[in-house]
Amino acid sequence: VATPGAEPMAFGGYAAALLLDADKMLRFDSLRAPEAALRRWLNAAALVRPAALEGTVVTTASPSPVEQALVRWDPAWFAREELEERAQTGLPPAVRTAAVTGAEADVRAFMEEFLGSSALPERVREQLRIVGPVPLDQGYFAWSESLEEDSEEAPVQGDWRTLMFFSYGIAQQVTRELRATRATIAALKKNVGERPVQIRCDGLDVL
């Protein structure tokens, strides 16, 4: 019995593996939940000896594209399907993202400064898709904990977040202005909260 990521090795491979609570990994409200679940399942299944040597993997997962990718042992197929779907819906990695996180007042002030900057061309501003600011809920923190990725800059309870989606074509201008806005706010000491707002581009755990 082992938790995901802590499976011990067995010389010659295990005779069998039972992937318990498989559906639980898919219930997280995150864009990355399916790919994270598949990665963990494949890592565990890879410790089992080949089927030609009577190795067996049993999963409790309900039928789904993720489960099919495991059964077919074809993560490349799953990745292609997922990428095509995200391209159609305008989600990363088909587009780039920027997350502004911190105290509500600081996030709102940052976005006002950013969008009001004369250095940000109107055509770029019009192409931004902005969601928020909204408070980070318990589901987000549960998902972050499941990733077991510690960070000193990790959001804390009570933080708010604004997400921006933008094409690769305008990414350089957007990220340059994000840096400039952060520098301006820091110089003017406009932060209300104890910490400055956190800006992350293309963060893997923000969706």
For the regions a protein language model found, what residue spans apply to each?
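Accessory helical-bundle/CTD segments and flexible terminal tails appended to RecA-like ATPase motors
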Residues: V1-P34, N43-L207
